[in-house]
Amino acid sequence: AHDITASAPVLAAIDISKARHEVLIEAPDKKRRRRVSVLNNLEEFDRLIGLLRSYQRPVRVAFEATGNYHRALAYQLGLAGFEIKLISSLALARTREALHNSWDKNDPKDAQVILHMMNIGAEQFYNDPLVHGTNDIQELSKTHDMVSRSKTELWHRILTHYLPLYF
């Protein structure tokens, strides 16, 4: 048997959705994985943080960024001092397909697939826009993008509709 050091982290794979998040927890010193459902509110986030802290080990959390639903939870987990990782949506879909032969986006196995990807190190860094002070830049960038698209749309409308009417 191999020695499990006290620094080996607890892994928490989170399948993010609008109302509730499914969490699969794997501790280095435990055989069985633990499943937890967390509603999308602060009280429930605190309950999860308490549970993860109770293992008395470093914690590494990973999830697929889903809309904006992951942001509040990621922020709280970051404040709690946990290491946060991102799982690429494309990599998750390909891995899910390879492991379970399933394309189903709402597969309950998603947390398992995320955990597998954590174990093989197929993760990306997660930079929380609020923590890193890039939130305003991100919002401005989104606004700029929307304005640019509207401008282009209007220009195309003028070119395709109004120009031919008069020339």
Language-model features, listed with the residues they occupy:
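Phosphate- and other anionic-substrate recognition elements at nucleic-acid/protein interfaces
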Residues: 1-167
